[in-house]
């Protein structure tokens, strides 16, 4: 249950050489529009869409686990999990050697330290401020009249380092406007913004420690400029990126639900 959308992953148990194995077979997103304010209704719609596309009924699903800010409002869920528990498990499934997981979505960012079983053993987050999350970058891209994708691509064309001191969206937007008025190239402004977001995210991750393989999950994986800024801030040469970053926490929920059925 994200701030912008609901993600669903359906896990199916199949037999491989006589042994049961899990396969994630269906994923579906229902975008929560501005008037769609009921998390339970949004979750119901997304869940029903997945069941219909898989040709299943609710009676054929053994458990429904949910995570995210709206998890307590999803009445039909079997159990709710924290974002850290679900994200760590999903990241571990995709990258078994991962020990540092960074989760950056629209409204929140967090860093997690995980063990070999995909359990979050420590975490730090920015739940009270969007300055370390995707919505901050999105607001700044609007100030430059660019899409978020264009914003990320533009930042890759800059090699300048421009510090941004503002700690909230309102003041940062004023800073961006000042840079525009001083004829600073858009590429340099885009990099400055993404560097600032990456710096705040990195500060959270450093509170739990950076070790082992680093994995980035959440919607900001799609922003190539942010990924590069985060590498620089963390001082790492590589960050592992899953193919379906928005679904990793939903996948983690499904994996934990499956484990608890056995």
Placement of each model-derived feature along the sequence:
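Adenine-nucleotide phosphate-binding core of ATP-dependent small-molecule kinases
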Residues: 172-205, 246
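Conserved ATP-utilizing enzyme core subdomain
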Residues: 131, 138, 142, 146-182
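Short glycine-rich, Thr/Ser-proximal phosphate-binding strand/loop in the N-terminal lobe
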Residues: 1-41, 120-123, 127-128
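Glycine-rich phosphate-binding loop of actin/hexokinase-like ATP-binding domains
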Residues: 31, 83-144, 259
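Glycine-rich phosphate-binding/hydrolytic loop that grips phosphoryl groups
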Residues: 134-138, 242-262
């Amino acid at each position: 249950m994200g701030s912008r959308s609901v993600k669903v992953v359906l896990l199916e148990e199949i037999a491989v050489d006589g042994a049961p194995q899990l396969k994630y077979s269906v994923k579906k997103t229902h975008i929560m529009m501005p008037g769609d304010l009921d998390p339970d209704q949004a979750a119901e719609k997304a869940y029903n869409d997945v069941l219909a596309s898989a040709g299943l009924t609710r009676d054929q699903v053994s458990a429904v686990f949910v995570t995210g800010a709206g998890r307590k409002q999803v009445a039909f869920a079997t159990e709710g999990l924290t974002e850290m528990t679900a994200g760590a498990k999903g990241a571990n499934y995709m990258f078994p050697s991962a020990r540092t997981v960074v989760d950056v979505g629209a409204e929140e960012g967090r860093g997690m330290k995980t063990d070999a079983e995909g359990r979050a053993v420590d975490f730090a987050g920015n739940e009270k401020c969007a300055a370390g999350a995707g919505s901050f970058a999105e607001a700044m891209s609007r100030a430059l009249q660019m899409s978020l994708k264009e914003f990320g691509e533009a930042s890759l064309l800059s090699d300048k380092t421009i510090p941004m001191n503002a700690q909230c969206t309102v003041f940062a937007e004023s800073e961006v406007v000042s840079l525009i008025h001083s004829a600073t190239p858009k590429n340099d402004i885009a990099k400055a913004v993404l560097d600032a977001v990456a710096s705040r995210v990195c500060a959270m991750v450093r509170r739990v420690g950076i070790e082992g393989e680093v994995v980035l999950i959440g919607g900001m994986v799609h922003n190539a400029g942010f990924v590069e800024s985060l590498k620089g801030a963390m001082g790492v040469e590589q960050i592992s990126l899953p193919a379906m970053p928005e679904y990793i926490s939903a996948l983690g929920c499904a994996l934990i639900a499956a484990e608890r059925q056995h």
